[in-house]
Amino acid sequence: MASIDPAQLVFVDECGTHTSMTRRRARARRGERARGRVPRNRGPVTTLLAGLSLAGMVTAMTVEGGTDTAVFAIYVEHFLLPALRPGQIVVVDNVGAHKPDRIRALIEAAGCLLVFLPAYSPDLSPVEEAFSKLKTFIRAAAARTRAALDAAIAVALSHSQ
């Protein structure tokens, strides 16, 4: 990996968001309690699939619910592949949805290479750090509907460029 140009790497992963995300800390005047509202019901999970390169976020897609092979294949085929250039290296973690031969075939047909991270090593993927920053922005937005959550994700992604 030492001989690889970092500009060729595209890290792809997914993260979950929901409509009850709120800031974890608050401020208040001395002697007063910090107050905030948090819904009791988390609502359905909205999964964000995104790719990160040295130039910033490559492409993103949201879907209600979790990620399986079919959802990941749609993301790769309709969102990631149009944004890739031949010769780029797509780096993913070892989730089962990333491993089918169809995913590898799609990426290699575009002239790119698919590489898997070692098991249990999310700290090797910089997209995890980007998701942490995105989630901080989404918590501050306090989106309580799916439409508001999608809008907050779009704004957060635009700030990450």
What name fits each language-model region?
Residues 1-161:
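Short functional hotspots at interaction and active-site rims
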